[in-house]
């Protein structure tokens, strides 16, 4: 692991330890989840770009991304302008997110919602369910193979989908061993935060046809989307370019249509 990811993982362990003290697992697991929505089906339907639109205030590499940050309003705008799913950053320390943002976004949309965070403990999976997540993110670079399989199976037992994220061919091979169709290719290195959207095109050849590739990071223009579609990639996780836009709804529409 690298320094940025190590820092995030170290802090996340401390964060989870505090959460477990405040609300032990036996208490958390008794809370009833709300309505579940089908994340996978939402990405499959029709041929227009399947955009997972992200609610993200800041990042370690870019600092503050959106000053005027109204989670409820952003969720509504994404829903009204053609997003297939939402992604909500819930990491507090590094992304200025919050777990409550996920519950709030879910209450303002009819779309399935992904919890975007750094999962390092099964406690967070139960927490995700209670918050209203329909899908969780597992980052291959953060977990060993036993954790990946255990966490994937637990999430699916709890009726959530799993998006597994890789950045290298080795990580992709590990991701493909998991029983989930959602394969994320992060074009941004978590080692140095450099971005190259060609990575998704390069790694696509190793992904079986029955999987859904979601290209993540660096998708900023209609041309980027057309490039990916020309290589058979039709699902996109897009955050920063939308969050920086003055008119989020228009920006989303511009990405999806000529």
From Swiss-Prot:
Keywords: Amino-acid biosynthesis, Aromatic amino acid biosynthesis, Decarboxylase, Lyase, Tryptophan biosynthesis
Pathway: Amino-acid biosynthesis; L-tryptophan biosynthesis; L-tryptophan from chorismate: step 4/5
Catalytic reaction(s) noted: 1-(2-carboxyphenylamino)-1-deoxy-D-ribulose 5-phosphate + H(+) = (1S,2R)-1-C-(indol-3-yl)glycerol 3-phosphate + CO2 + H2O
GO function terms (MF aspect): indole-3-glycerol-phosphate synthase activity; phosphoribosylanthranilate isomerase activity
EC number, as in UniProt: 4.1.1.48
Nucleus found in the keyword field: no
PROSITE patterns hit by this protein: IGPS (PS00614)
Keyword RNA-binding: no
UniProt GO BP: L-tryptophan biosynthetic process
Enzyme class: lyase
Pfam families from the UniProt entry: IGPS (PF00218)
Similarity remark: Belongs to the TrpC family.
Stored NCBIfam families: PRK00278.1-6, PRK00278.2-4
Protein name: Indole-3-glycerol phosphate synthase
Organism: Legionella pneumophila subsp. pneumophila (strain Philadelphia 1 / ATCC 33152 / DSM 7513)
């Amino acid at each position: 692991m690298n320094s940025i990811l190590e820092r995030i993982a170290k802090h996340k362990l401390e964060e989870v330890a505090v959460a477990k003290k405040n609300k032990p697992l036996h208490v958390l697991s008794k809370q009833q989840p709300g309505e579940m929505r089908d994340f996978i089906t939402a990405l499959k339907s029709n041929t227009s770009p399947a955009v997972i639109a992200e609610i993200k205030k800041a990042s370690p590499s870019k600092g503050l991304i959106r000053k005027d940050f109204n989670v409820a309003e952003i969720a509504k705008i994404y829903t009204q302008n053609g997003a297939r799913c939402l992604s909500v950053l819930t990491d507090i320390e590094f992304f200025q997110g919050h777990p409550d943002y996920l519950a709030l976004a879910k209450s303002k949309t009819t779309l399935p919602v992904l919890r975007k965070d750094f999962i390092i403990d099964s406690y967070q999976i139960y927490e995700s369910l209670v918050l209203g997540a329909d899908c969780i993110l597992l980052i291959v670079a953060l977990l060993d193979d036993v954790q990946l399989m255990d966490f994937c199976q637990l999430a699916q037992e709890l009726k959530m989908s799993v998006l597994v994220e890789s950045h290298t061919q080795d990580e992709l091979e590990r991701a493909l061993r998991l029983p989930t169709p959602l394969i994320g290719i992060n074009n941004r290195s978590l080692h140095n935060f450099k971005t190259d959207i060609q990575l998704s095109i390069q790694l696509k050849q190793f992904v079986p046809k029955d999987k859904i590739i979601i290209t993540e990071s660096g998708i900023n223009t209609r041309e980027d989307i057309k490039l990916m579609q020309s290589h058979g990639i039709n699902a996109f996780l897009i955050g920063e370019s939308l969050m920086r836009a003055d008119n989020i709804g228009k920006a989303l529409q511009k990405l999806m249509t000529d």
